[in-house]
Amino acid sequence: MKIKIICVGKIKEKYLKDGIAEYQKRLSRFTQFEIIELADEKTPEKASQAENEKIMEKEANRILSKIGNRDYVIALAIEGKQYASEEFSQFITDITIQGFSDITFIIGGSLGLHSKIKQKAHALISFGRLTLPHQLMRLVLTEQIYRAFMIQEGSPYHK
């Protein structure tokens, strides 16, 4: 199995990089794991809705170029389905049972995801109604993917 996270924007904060690196290392015993960082578009301070739409579309085109034809695509979106950790673990298991060996998670930039990404996705998921910086969401998602594997293993990590 291969899991990748495609995300818009770079992480500058060392503490986030360190946390993500730790979970990447832990995940290596379960899966090939990759994070693909894509450049974000500069957003003018008082951008119009039309300008924001163009920015999201440019970012969407970059994202689409990194999605494999056989990937099961999961986009993170506020309107997505929410899961408890155990349910998320089962969701990952169910995807593999359906015959998918490559799972791709997508985290948008500061403006969110363009509709064409949401339409391409097999599933939309949400980690709650809170708004989190996309850099922090990357750490949260990486930890939850690791937790999903630990739940599948019956590990005491998840209590």
Curated annotation (Swiss-Prot):
Localization of this protein: Cytoplasm
EC number: 2.1.1.177
Keyword terms, alphabetized: Cytoplasm, Methyltransferase, rRNA processing, S-adenosyl-L-methionine, Transferase
GO molecular function: rRNA (pseudouridine-N3-)-methyltransferase activity
Gene3D superfamilies for this protein: 3.40.1280.10
Pfam families assigned: SPOUT_MTase
Major localization class: cytoplasm
Enzyme class at the top of the EC tree: transferase
Residues that coordinate or bind S-adenosyl-L-methionine: 76, 108, 127-132
InterPro entries: Alpha/beta_knot_MTases, RlmH-like, tRNA_m1G_MTases_N
Keyword Transferase included in the entry's annotation: yes
Catalytic activity of the protein: pseudouridine(1915) in 23S rRNA + S-adenosyl-L-methionine = N(3)-methylpseudouridine(1915) in 23S rRNA + S-adenosyl-L-homocysteine + H(+)
A GO-annotated cellular component: cytoplasm
Stated family: Belongs to the RNA methyltransferase RlmH family.
HAMAP family: 23SrRNA_methyltr_H
NCBIfam families assigned: PRK00103.1-3, tRNA_RlmH_YbeA
Main function: Specifically methylates the pseudouridine at position 1915 (m3Psi1915) in 23S rRNA.
Assembly mode: Homodimer.
Protein name in the entry: Ribosomal RNA large subunit methyltransferase H
Species name: Streptococcus uberis (strain ATCC BAA-854 / 0140J)
